[in-house]
Structure formats: structure tokens, C-alpha cells
Design a protein with these regions (language model features):
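Metal-dependent phosphoester/phosphodiester hydrolase catalytic core
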Residues: 1-201
Length: 201
């Protein structure tokens, strides 16, 4: 924060910060290994993630949520009667990057985790704002290859698995969330996303 331009930006422009994989390592999940990556002197990915989250929480301009929720990154930012912004966390509660073709939900198919999905659905249902904006770490329909598993199957970093047909893997959790939004009749939900290096609507 020694740069006058950075300080000016922070004092004049509202910012919403989100946890990203690069706080730890590219395409971070608990399954990631940096054992053969010479850039890392610390090889324990969970320890790297804890250090990255601490640095993020100490540096990011976020409103505190109290001692009980000091490590929680997902949050709601009310913007008056026009908008509620739901900032979700697609990194801290996800299962390992895998072949992403599991037929049933479980810890290995989590992207948000059950508590966060329920928090989001409950918040969207309670919201009286005209627009419900979901700020997502990454697009929900993007498929990002992340190497191969021990059996030679493609591993996936994001929600989608690149397969046609019924949802499988991480898509199951997202399908449950989207179905919950539809079944509750929640209107004016808009997804805003980052992580990709282009704009689209």
C-alpha cells in the first residue's frame, strides 16, 4: 500500500474481493500437489492454503463478520432496495479435482459445500431486493481440464465436466442449486463471474 495510485483507487472505488486459486497454486484444490514444483519450498498444500487465506483476510478490504465467522469468505453485501450481492466461495469447501463424472453427490463432488448452498438459497429466498447478484469465482458452465488422474481419466478444475447429458460430478451440486432457485420462484438472479480473461453476457 505504499503506492499512491493504489491508495487512491482504494479510497475512491468500491471493491469486492474474492478468494482465488492463485492465492495458493494454479487450479488449487486439496488434491493438488506441488511436490515436484521447484517454485515452492513448502510442499504441504493445506498449509499453503491456510497461509494464503490468512494473508487474504489480513489484506482484503472486507467487512468483518465477527469472531465466529472470521474465516468465512462467502457473504452477502446488501446494496439497498435494488440489489443484494451474494459473494460465494468456490475454493474453500470444494472436493478434489477429479474425473468429475460421479453419479451421486458426495464430498468429492462439492464445489460450494452443503452449508454454503443452503446459505445461498436461504438468502436468495429472503432477499427483497429487485436484483440478486451472485458473484462467483468462476463461470458455472466453464470446463477446465486439470491433467489426468492415476487411471488416465481427464481431471476437471471447474464445475462442468465437458460431457453431454444429465449432470454428474460437481454439476450435481450446481443443478441442485439452480433447481432450488427455480422451484422457489426466485426472480432476477444474475451471475457475475471472474477467473476467465474475457467478457461475455
Amino acid at each position: 500500500l505504499m503506492d499512491a495510485n493504489v491508495r487512491a483507487l482504494g479510497s475512491e472505488v468500491a471493491q469486492i474481493w474474492q478468494w482465488d486459486d492463485h492465492e495458493v497454486t494454479n487450479n488449487y484444490s486439496d488434491s493438488k500437489s506441488v511436490a515436484n514444483d521447484t517454485r515452492y519450498t513448502e510442499k504441504n498444500v493445506q498449509l499453503l492454503a491456510a497461509r494464503g487465506q490468512r494473508a487474504f483476510m489480513e489484506y482484503a478490504p472486507m467487512r468483518p463478520f465477527g469472531a465466529a465467522m472470521h474465516q468465512r469468505l462467502y457473504r452477502r453485501l446488501p446494496q439497498g432496495p435494488l440489489a443484494d450481492i451474494f459473494v460465494i466461495d468456490m475454493r474453500s469447501h470444494r472436493g478434489p479435482n477429479s474425473h468429475n463424472l460421479q453419479a451421486a453427490e458426495g464430498p468429492d463432488t462439492d464445489m460450494l459445500g452443503r452449508p454454503q448452498v443452503q446459505w445461498l438459497l436461504d438468502g436468495l429466498k429472503r432477499s427483497r431486493a429487485t436484483w440478486k447478484l451472485i458473484a462467483s469465482d468462476m463461470p458455472i458452465s466453464l470446463f477446465v481440464p486439470d491433467g489426468k488422474d492415476a487411471e488416465g481419466r481427464a481431471q476437471w478444475e471447474a464445475v462442468a465436466n465437458g460431457e453431454h447429458g444429465a449432470p454428474r460430478g460437481r454439476e450435481l451440486e450446481m443443478a441442485r442449486l439452480l433447481k432450488g432457485i427455480k422451484n422457489a420462484g426466485i426472480r432476477n438472479v444474475v451471475w457475475l463471474t471472474a477467473d476467465v480473461h474475457y467478457t461475455a453476457a
